[in-house]
């Protein structure tokens, strides 16, 4: 896996410790930071994007039929990916950078299958106290049923879900269930967190799955900064 790190302004000269956003997959980092700067937002956090060896394999929790006829079936290696992230990459970051290592200051973001894995992580590791699933592939075969059977490992979670209003128009009969599945995931998480102090926020965006990805990340980051 390849990683790319963003450091906040003044990091090299200071002694302050910072919260960290880990991102499942590559993101348009320069564009996101430019939008934040243009909004007058000071990005006082570390951000590490993690490129997987295989998007479809590393960001699926179990095997499933191929998403499209021309693709191979996903191999369901998210457990191994999350183990590496939580047990190797995060400890390295905490040891070599001035992070705030506590889960409350540690977020996991992801888009599409990366967003699916951000939610899945809540049931597999307690390393992350915040998760953001942007246009997450929560339609994935059996995922809502998995959420209903299992429980998150933390009860103080803060969770952000977002979805484009046109995403359910997909011609793919599995993917066009995404709106119903995301709404169901929100219900499940809200019920599981109950009165424990955890919170779930769901935001609708304009457009389809690939519309304004930078803007959707900016919205999620600004939500996180407000609750951090």
Q: Which ranges hold each PLM region?
A:
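The feature captures the conserved acid-bearing segment of alpha/beta-hydrolase catalytic domains
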Residues: 138-212, 219, 224
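A domain-start/cap signature at the N-terminus of enzymes
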Residues: 1-19
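Active-site loop/turn elements of alpha/beta-hydrolase fold enzymes
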Residues: 50-52, 136, 207
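Alpha/beta-hydrolase fold nucleophile elbow
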Residues: 98-111, 131
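Short glycine-enriched nucleophile-adjacent loop
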Residues: 115-124
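Serine-hydrolase catalytic machinery in alpha/beta-hydrolase-like enzymes
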Residues: 20-84, 88, 92-98
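The conserved beta1-alpha1 loop
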Residues: 19, 24-25, 135, 163
């Amino acid at each position: 896996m390849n990683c790319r790190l963003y450091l906040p302004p003044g990091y090299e000269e200071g002694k302050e410790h910072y919260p960290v956003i880990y991102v499942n997959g590559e993101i348009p980092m320069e564009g996101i930071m430019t939008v934040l700067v243009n909004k007058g937002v000071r990005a006082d956090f570390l951000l590490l994007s993690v490129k997987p060896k295989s998007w479809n394999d590393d960001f699926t929790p179990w095997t499933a039929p191929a998403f499209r006829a021309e693709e191979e079936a996903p191999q369901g290696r998210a457990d191994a990916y999350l183990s590496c992230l939580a047990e190797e990459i995060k400890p390295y970051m905490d040891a070599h950078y001035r992070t705030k290592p506590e889960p409350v200051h540690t977020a996991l973001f992801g888009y599409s299958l990366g967003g699916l894995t951000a939610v899945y992580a809540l049931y597999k590791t307690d390393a992350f106290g915040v998760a953001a699933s942007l246009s997450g592939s929560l339609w994935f075969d059996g995922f809502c049923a998995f959420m209903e059977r299992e429980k998150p490992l933390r009860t103080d979670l803060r969770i952000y879900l977002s979805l484009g209003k046109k995403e359910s128009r997909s011609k793919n009969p599995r993917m066009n269930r995404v709106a119903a599945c995301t709404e169901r995931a929100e219900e499940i998480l809200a019920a599981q967190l109950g009165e424990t102090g955890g919170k779930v926020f769901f935001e609708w965006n304009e457009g389809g799955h690939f519309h304004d990805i930078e803007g959707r990340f900016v919205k999620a980051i600004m939500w996180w900064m407000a609750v951090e």
